């Protein structure tokens, strides 16, 4: 399982102590955004697997917004954000094409 990290020594300088306080806040904010990102991506992928085109499109728009936010804040590199959006978009688009082809075959 995961082992606890060894405790770091406290900084001596005031600027170092302030930096530690800031890091704790930033870490919490970044972790929250990453979690939001993972949840959004999973929701889009679930909708695609379920074959729900409208829901997938709606969730993709929300996921796209979250990915852009994370990229703007510098949590993810802009290229990673673009790559993730592209892959999700391809899945949603493939679902839409599949939905269009299915009625004509039946």
Curated annotation (Swiss-Prot):
Signal peptide: none annotated. It holds the Pfam family Ribosomal_S20p. Residues 1-20 have a biased composition (Basic residues). Residues 1-21 are annotated as: Disordered. The keyword Secreted does not apply. Gene3D superfamilies: Ribosomal protein S20 (1.20.58.110). GO terms for molecular function: small ribosomal subunit rRNA binding; structural constituent of ribosome. GO terms for biological process: translation. InterPro entries: Ribosomal_bS20, Ribosomal_bS20_sf. GO terms for cellular component: cytosol; small ribosomal subunit. Keywords: Ribonucleoprotein, Ribosomal protein, RNA-binding, rRNA-binding. PANTHER family: 30S RIBOSOMAL PROTEIN S20 (PTHR33398), SMALL RIBOSOMAL SUBUNIT PROTEIN BS20C (PTHR33398:SF1). HAMAP family: Ribosomal_bS20. Binds directly to 16S ribosomal RNA. Belongs to the bacterial ribosomal protein bS20 family. This is Small ribosomal subunit protein bS20. It comes from Polaromonas naphthalenivorans (strain CJ2). The gene is rpsT.
């Amino acid at each position: 399982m995961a082992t606890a990290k060894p405790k770091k020594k406290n900084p001596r300088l005031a600027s170092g102590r302030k930096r530690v306080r800031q890091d704790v806040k930033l870490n919490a904010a970044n972790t929250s955004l990453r979690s939001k990102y993972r949840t959004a991506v999973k929701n889009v992928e679930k909708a695609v697997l379920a074959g729900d085109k409208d829901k997938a499109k709606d969730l993709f728009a929300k996921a796209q917004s979250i990915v852009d936010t994370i990229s703007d804040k510098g949590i993810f590199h802009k290229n990673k954000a673009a790559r993730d959006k592209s892959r999700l978009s391809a899945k949603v688009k493939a679902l839409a094409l599949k939905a269009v082809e299915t009625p004509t075959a039946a």
